């Protein structure tokens, strides 16, 4: 049976039209995976095998990854934006949100993300999997080099900026035309799989879900960008805490988590509720059955497997 799809603007489009748009998304994600995700692995292997003997190994690998992160993110998602006719200016506009709302959103975000990161780390240890505690899409850190301004700039500012542009500014905004629930879930799944480490799967899902809901609530990526940057900065701050004082970090995270739970069940956490619908469920099935989307997701899974096996 052939279905027509109802878009958010009440316009009805054919299944072939939707297939073409979803195929473009899949192809863009494939390009993103091949350039942004696999380039660091290729650079590391090439440098370690002496193909560039005159260059310092870590620096060269990072420079190649840095360039790939920018090009591989901007180019494919620019294609998606043009095909969908997505107005990025509308999603980068100022919002009617005050400082108290920013702080509430951040406490909820970081409380749940930090707790998820801690739980996921325990699970990976029980499974005997060597997890990378802190990483970001495209560039993986075996440890946060807090004495390196370039690493810090990338982790705290560049990665959040590119991720919010790509996943919330372009992908979420574009897919929202077929329903907010559909866009929320698909963006969250893609964002989760795009992360490199098994030890980040649960926190990445929490991050993607909360940042996407925040963006849909305020119809702008500014709140999510601010929250993302502050979250990464605080993670770097935790990296500075000596191991013998790590108990204080856990206590701080526990307090934030309790406060986050209280805020969620109070009326102060003003995040919209997004329910599923038959059209969203149909769009999800159609999206996940697209061959290009499937290949892109498999590339993400393959990358995670390689990272785990190679202990990159």
Regions found by a protein language model. Name each.
Residues 52-61, 89-159, 305-312:
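Juxtamembrane helix-loop-helix connectors linking adjacent transmembrane helices
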Residues 3-4:
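Short, positively charged and aromatic/hydrophobic N-terminal segments
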Residues 33-83, 249-255:
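Alpha-helical transmembrane segments in multi-pass membrane proteins
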Residues 8-33, 57-59, 86-117, 275-298:
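Interfacial transmembrane-helix boundary/kink motif in multi-pass membrane proteins
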Residues 149-308, 312:
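Transmembrane helix-loop-helix hairpins at the membrane interface
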Residues 25-40, 66-74, 102-114, 118, ...:
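Alpha-helical transmembrane spans of integral membrane proteins, capturing the lipid-embedded, hydrophobic core
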Residues 8-13, 51, 63-110, 125-127, ...:
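Membrane-helix interface linkers and caps
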